[in-house]
Amino acid sequence: MATAASASASASPAAAFGAKTRRPGPSPSPSPSPASAFARPSPRASAAGRLHASLHLGGASATGSSIVSNASGIHLAAPVLAPLAVPKMTGAVGAHKNVLLFHCEEMRELAEQVVARNDDIELRSISWRTFADGFPNLFISNAHTIRGQHVAFLASFSSPSVIFEQLSIIYALPKLFISSFTLILPFFPTGTSERMEDEGDVATAFTLARILSNIPISRGGPSSLVIFDIHALQERFYFGDSVLPCFESGIPLLKSRLQELPDSDNITIAFPDDGAWKRFYKQLQHFPMVVCNKVREGEQRIVRIKEGDPRGRHVVIVDDLVQSGGTLIECQKVLAEHGAAKVSAYVTHGIFPNKSWEKFQPDNGEGPGHGLSHFWITDSCPLTVNAVKDRQPFEILSLAGPIASALQI
């Protein structure tokens, strides 16, 4: 009895309770070990395994697989997914576009230079003829081949007589189902007529801006308009919303040329008036500067030095354009009187009506009182370029490079 009592006392209450209530049946499965519990597949791994099996049965094959075991000892092959391929970006920064370049007759030489600067630009031709009554008879060669292409036109509005025929081409090109259209007008000719000083004055700069703002839209959207060193900064607001004006400058050409001079470390920039200073001083602010202005004495307008010291320096007068050249010559004389060692000049647009370029003579090493050491102009006005080519003190800085770059914008 004592032995039976001790045995009964050693049994746990749960065991005793179970002995009374549990029915006979199969013994429970043993608890899984820590190792087998760790190997139990996650729902994601099981799904991946089923996916791999379905792909394999369907005839497809995965790029790779890993082995996963579950508690039942079944081995599942889970695919190792290859990294996603990132598609190449089209139109990324630095990408080049092929451009078909048309031009007016005056701009043939400059257009050829632009094409020589960039292999992505192709020269195209236009037949410029006239009817017996003098009106233009124009023909765009191979017009069907420019569909879907980027097209540009290099224009020169050197006189009112050529503007109409060029506008006819400018309005026709965007309608030939081209991808985009760019008008390069290096010199905006009515820029000096931008304001009214008396009732009845007509601001022809605004008139021309309105005409160019109505260039037809191409399939790619509004046309682009490239202009170099427009005379008045507010003229950029004369253009409507249907054209995208892009204002470039010829000053980088001047800066590169100045670096090539033997006395490049002795350069001072002079501005003939406050307008020129406002327009260009930010691009030339690392140079010493002289600012001139005009003052009225009786019936005469005299150029005076407003600020700066030209003494002993090679002074370069900078402006956007020159017509008769009277102000520039007066500025040259004042700088020479105040001790400038040399005087040169730069303008982006050399207009020189009535052969006024003949007023400018080279100094021939005799000093600034006798003439200019250099007179740099760009080829924005081709008729002037033909007149002053190979004549001292003139030197041509070509816009071909900047135009080629602008066509890739």
UniProtKB/Swiss-Prot annotation:
Keywords: ATP-binding, Chloroplast, Kinase, Magnesium, Metal-binding, Nucleotide biosynthesis, Nucleotide-binding, Plastid, Transferase, Transit peptide. Residues 1-16, 34-43 have a biased composition (Low complexity). GO terms for cellular component: chloroplast; cytoplasm; ribose phosphate diphosphokinase complex. GO terms for molecular function: ATP binding; kinase activity; magnesium ion binding; ribose phosphate diphosphokinase activity. Its cofactor is Mg(2+). It holds the Pfam family Pribosyltran. CDD domains: PRTases_typeI. GO terms for biological process: 5-phosphoribose 1-diphosphate biosynthetic process; purine nucleotide biosynthetic process. Its EC number is 2.7.6.1. Mg(2+) binds at residues 229, 231. Belongs to the ribose-phosphate pyrophosphokinase family. This is Ribose-phosphate pyrophosphokinase 3, chloroplastic. It comes from Oryza sativa subsp. japonica.
